Amino acid sequence: MAYSYTEKKRIRKSFAKRAAVLDAPFLLATQIESFASFLQAETPPESRYNQGLQAAFTSIFPISSHSGNARLEFVQYMLGEPAFDVKECQQRGLTFASPLRARVRLVIMDREAPKETIKEVKEQEVYMGEIPLMTTTGSFVINGTERVIVSQLHRSPGVFFEHDRGKTHSSGKLLFSARIIPYRGSWLDFEFDPKDYLYFRVDRRRKMPVTILLRAIGMTPEEILETFHDFDAFHLSAEGAQFELVPDRLRGEVARFDIVDPTGKVIVARDKRITAKHIRELDQAGIKMIGVPDDFVLGRIIARNVVDPETGELLARANEEITEDLLGKLRDAGVRDLVTLYVNDLDRGAYISSTLRIDETADQWAARVAIYRMMRPGEPPTEEAVEALFQGLFYAPERYDLSTVGRMKFNRRAYPEKIDDKAPGWLKRFYDKVGPHGEEGEGVLANEDILAVIGVLVELRNGRGEIDDIDHLGNRRVRSVGELAENQFRAGLVRVERAVKERLSQAESDNLMPHDLINAKPISAAIKEFFGSSQLSQFMDQTNPLSEITHKRRVSALGPGGLTRERAGFEVRDVHPTHYGRVCPIETPEGPNIGLINSLAVYARTNRHGFLETPYRKVTDGKVTDQIDFLSAIEEGQYVIAQANAEIGGDGALEGDLVSCRHKGEFMLATADQVQYMDVAPGQIVSVAASLIPFLEHDDANRALMGANMQRQAVPCLRPEKPLVGTGIERTVAVDSGTAVQAMRGGVVDYVDAQRVVVRVNDNEALAGEVGVDIYNMIKYTRSNQNTNINQRPVVRVGDLIAKGDVIADGASTDLGELALGQNMLVAFMPWNGYNFEDSILISERVVADDRFTSIHVEELTVVARDTKLGPEEITRDIASLGEAQLSRLDESGIVYIGAEVEAGDVLVGKVTPKGETQLTPEEKLLRAIFGEKASDVKDTSLRVPSGMTGTVIDVQVFTREGIERDKRAQSIIDDQLRSFKTDLADQMRIVERDAFARIQRMIVGQKANGGPKKLAKGAAITAEYLETLEFYHWFDIRMADEELAIQLEAVREGLEKTRKDFEQAFEIKKKKLTQGDELPPDVQKMVKVYLAVKRRLQPGDKMAGRHGNKGVVSKIVPVEDMPYMEDGTPVDIVLNPLGVPSRMNIGQILETHLGWAAKGLGQKIDRLLRANAAAGEVRGLLEEIYNGSGKPEDFSEFTDGDVIELATNLKKGVPFATPVFDGAKEEEIAKMLELAGLPVGGQVTLFDGRTGEAFERKVTVGYKHVLKLHHLVDDKMHARSTGPYSLVTQQPLGGKAQFGGQRFGEMEVWALEAYGAAYTLQEMLTVKSDDVTGRTKVYENIVKGEHKIDSGMPESFNVLVKEIRSLAIDIDLDRE
């Protein structure tokens, strides 16, 4: 395979046995595509799809006035340019957003005209608020901080059938229920109760018999019974009754009388159970009617109203039970035909019939009133109100919407494509009547929808059909950024609609324009609330590139419209078979959110309906093809799918008699010809973080979960180091996260320094007349959300040839374009003097000395000068209470210099606040009268370095309100920024010009001219020497003979002119932005931000971890000479406890250690070759041996000798290996690599004690392992207090480091002191060290006087207790005797 420029520098040797069929997709695609489809900014207005903003507008507009005489129509929307770019928004604390304008049309109708006539039309663009924009890396900048909108996994709209699992009723009876969930609108539930009555409820309110709803939609009792029941027919006569025989209905019944055929032969004797054999005999005998005794008719239910044929009198109502009296009455009236309901206890329950019997409503109006009373208790039901409420519930598009997804799910479930032959007649009749339903349909419910749901539910109760699994991913869908933002925007528009409706009636009389009608405030407020404070809008986790990418790929079941932690049970949190390839079964938080927050699998994506789908390779006739299909969980169930590790022959045929497959969520074995699909990759089931764990298949899942989570907490080291043992996905993560800088176009590197890289673009990639130069500015020492340091370093050199997509610069935690979260350490698994007891970690001093785990953290400290009631605060250097030493670091404006080394308590920004006027003593008055104004009326409120922090000032920013004069420091910062921007532009222009003139030279040298400067003769050929005699810009004066060339020359001249103008304009815009006042919160005059770079070295108490969930705390840093060392004198870096492995079952770490040692050993072998100045051929031979021994082969034939030597040089520190998840290195391959490196194949070696020089008695496992330093640093947790702030009421010290609080001395600690009998210590703890106010003061005085004694009084808690008891109206007082 062809390697890119940076990949060629260091190739990762892969042990993958299967070539990748499908590369990992762009990892941020879900976020970026979702938001792009919401904005549709690049699409011309007339060809926009009805989604996102467009859908929100079209669903609300047109808005008509109440009278219908005026309406406001939506034409199109436009997005403007954002006022500030991302970086400026972050610095100034602004939102990166662009203004949204909508073109709307106000149409006023002519009232006087007989038919609808338009009187006037006004069209106008109206400002609709600001819409936050997504950055290129999929985040948003809101009020200066980067945030991520997490996708939500919610229950899909549609219809769901379930039962209570027998938990409701003591008998354990299954109570079935159905629920119609719309995207917007009221939920409609249907449920059976233990007595088998069917009820419905709206929005979980009071339940009512379902027949009330059926009556409300206009059905009569007869229609209701006909829809949900089959009928039996009887012919009555004076002698008895004849029964129309349907033999199938008798199966399983006990015959209550002899059933005989026309010849008199008894087919079924009395009291015998009727079997299938009997039914066949009845069929053959052709019996249509049989005589039955009256008691066979009694107790049955009449299906239709029975009317006296002569008088027309109603003899019996539908749904009435037949009694002896009624039967006699019917005979007397001469009724011949009687139709009853066919019911039995087994599979034809009389549920609807019995429910109809408890329904007290008489007709449609009464039913609707009953529903109105249930929805609006206490309100009088007027005709309009009842009608409006009922229509608004499920039939009004503005109130109720199933959405396309909901309709698709509803139709698939409620209208099955094929109906079971065993289905009852009434159900078949119903489906024949409504006809087939596709996946499309209205967003509102139709009457037939309600009937279909009740039909399916009744069938479930009858024992036919399956309930739904609500945790199936076919029933849960993903709402991404775009959809969530659209819902919020629509909510804002709905608020606007109400106001517009009110104002539209005035539009005609007051001659209003559209902008007078629309107020953008509600829209802005809705959007602002969503992006600023929604549960799904989260502060981005920016510790390292992996944590960023994982945060954006997260799916949460929490949030508005989702679950809550407390209510979510085990089932929702559990791993489900449909998670395969869609949601990672490993990566989820530990704690209360476990299973509710998940991570997308590497290859997963959402389809247009929002369901997760995963790719599979098509298998036809037992042969694997290259066709790749994405299947959702709904579709996947019907296929037989082989795993990615199934053996495939050379011709692509599946090998082996039986192949391990999945079908309908179960594992099974199938023959090759039964297989329909196959996984695309072994690592398809896991997420990005989990697929970064090498040998994941050898780790216990619980530990793998911790490993995946802890990688996200790894702090970027000062010098990132690629993992020796990786999985091959490291490059994808580094590049897709946006941390490493990628080339936008190919070309030659023209200039490199720490700040920027300039690339001269290839001629074939530069557009005609366009500037062929790309300039990449590096991000230098910037603070991330988690205070880690973001810094980019170029990895290319001048003259390098690069292609599009190559890595140009490394960012935090990346090394040559690969993710590098930690450092490769030489580890030994052995106990060492108890210092690695219980997962503690012993580390060599050399690791600290070499700054291996040193990290830089950037702290932002802010001070604001406000306008107070007593006068404005002032940022100044003149502070009386500060000595010269403290002021030495401040400039004349009172702000610290950049580069100053500061420690806790040092002043960074001097500030004074006016103090309230106090009563002056006569002496002070006299002094003030003599010496004038005294400086005591201000107090020092300067910004100081917080306790426990030392660092270097790396940046200062000053923000000044509009209309307030800037101080010298603020002005100098602006001047510096403008100067550097100007230099930047000048450099860019110079590079652009140089590139353009080099291009012209290549174009015109050797061509003929028609004349030109310095008397160039007509027809003369242009030479390079002639061009050198001219000023660059005079080249354009040469008149070319070739017209085509002349046109190209003119295009370049225009391009340069345009670039110059663009640069001038950019400078003017920048100048305007910098010189205008800053937007600050009300009453803030000035704000200063100081950035400190804090260097954190590794120290005892810091938390460290491997990638396999093996975490521990550094217990001791041991001098190098005391560490165990190998035979050649190499001391180990880290000593880990071997007891941490067996019980936790994360064996992956041991395999990583062995393979890491081989990687390092091979690197040393290459190093020895290079030191011996071996020929390139010999080096090439060794590389061939390493890379092509097993696993994925590499082709070095296209590498020049120079390439080979550069590759070998980069491999000196170790040959990086990739062992992909579930397709990694086998033990024999590791052994082979160890052997090739000349290391013991067992991976164990004799170590010597550094203190005594003696060998340890048995061999120790030694090797290289990638170790991370986690963001739980002891510096952030260490805290000490002597005196400090107290709580106002209880007078006890506050708690926590942030409040500079004390340590809690709790109940158990008191018991401990009691047990020791340490009475005085205990008294001191409970009084003067806590809340004895007078005692505290007294102790202070005593210490000042030098007397070390305690006078303890009464703790303040007693006073609090007295006050609390008094608040209960019990008068109690303390006896202070």
UniProtKB/Swiss-Prot annotation:
Keyword Disulfide bond among record annotations: no
Annotated coiled-coil segments of the chain: none
Transmembrane segments: none
Enzyme class: transferase
Entry EC number(s): 2.7.7.6
Keywords linked to the UniProt accession: DNA-directed RNA polymerase, Nucleotidyltransferase, Transcription, Transferase
Cellular component terms per the entry's GO annotation: DNA-directed RNA polymerase complex
Gene Ontology BP annotations: DNA-templated transcription
Catalytic activity: RNA(n) + a ribonucleoside 5'-triphosphate = RNA(n+1) + diphosphate
InterPro entries given in the database record: DNA-dir_RNA_pol_bsu_external_1 (IPR019462), DNA-dir_RNA_pol_su2 (IPR015712), DNA-dir_RNAP_su2_dom (IPR007120), DNA-dir_RNAP_su2_hyb_sf (IPR037033), RNA_pol_bsu_bac (IPR010243), RNA_pol_bsu_CS (IPR007121), RNA_pol_bsu_protrusion (IPR007644), RNA_pol_Rpb2_2 (IPR007642)
Secretion signal span: none
Molecular functions per Gene Ontology: DNA binding; DNA-directed RNA polymerase activity; ribonucleoside binding
Task of the protein: DNA-dependent RNA polymerase catalyzes the transcription of DNA into RNA using the four ribonucleoside triphosphates as substrates.
Complex formation: The RNAP catalytic core consists of 2 alpha, 1 beta, 1 beta' and 1 omega subunit. When a sigma factor is associated with the core the holoenzyme is formed, which can initiate transcription.
Family: Belongs to the RNA polymerase beta chain family.
Record's protein name: DNA-directed RNA polymerase subunit beta
